[in-house]
Amino acid sequence: MQKKFVLAIGVAVALGACHSTSYHSDEAIVEVPFTEVHVTDHFWAPRIEVNRTVSIPSAFRQCEINGRFDNFALAGGLIKGEHKGDFPFDDTDPYKIIEGASYSLAVKYDPKLDAYLDSVITLIGAAQEPDGYLTTCVTNKCERLNRWWGSKRWEKLNSHELYNSGHLYEAAVAHYQATGKRSLLDIALKNADLVCKDFGPGEGQKHVPSGHPIIEMGLAKLYKVTDEQKYLDMAKYFVEETG
């Protein structure tokens, strides 16, 4: 019995020691930047390399085949034609792939991929309207998709306009952190400034939720790289407005 009692005390002391060094709720949680993470094992490293050499180029090729890039070129007045695709959120395909490609550049620099991203970002910049607005099906006035976006910008919650913006922001931050280039980041900030102007609790602003979560995360990331409080406030507004 005495041995059991001593053992119990020992376990209690050990647990107490563990508790004293555990995480405290008032401590900030800071993620490890992806630019500082490099996987070199024999399982994941080869797959990451396949992603760089096969998957990412294939994904961009699908954007070329399915008109994702053409929509940006059309919105920018670089080509003539009709808007392609069946959804208002097709713009996010290039954004998502740019984000992934940026992670890849941080792992292993690829000058060909870097230059390709520059060319895609040029198209995206051409499609952006002077005040920062960026959703190609709206700029291109694609009547086929009116059931999604209506007849003017910001008209319907299910338009995915803010969803598009959120993925743009995430791609822009990843590209900036991986390359140091501001080309896509400046496009994203111009769009975010428009969102901060048009949405919110103030008079004359749209008092609505985002319609589809992702812009909240994107705005928070913009805040982290710019230290501009308005982006974090905008993210908080959308979260609270959603309820």
Residue ranges and their predicted role:
Residues 1-2, 19-22:
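Bimodal feature
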Residues 2-8:
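Sec-dependent signal peptide recognition
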Residues 15-17:
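C-terminal motif of bacterial Sec signal peptides marking the signal peptidase cleavage site
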Residues 22-243:
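Glycan-recognition and catalytic cores of secretory/periplasmic carbohydrate-active enzymes
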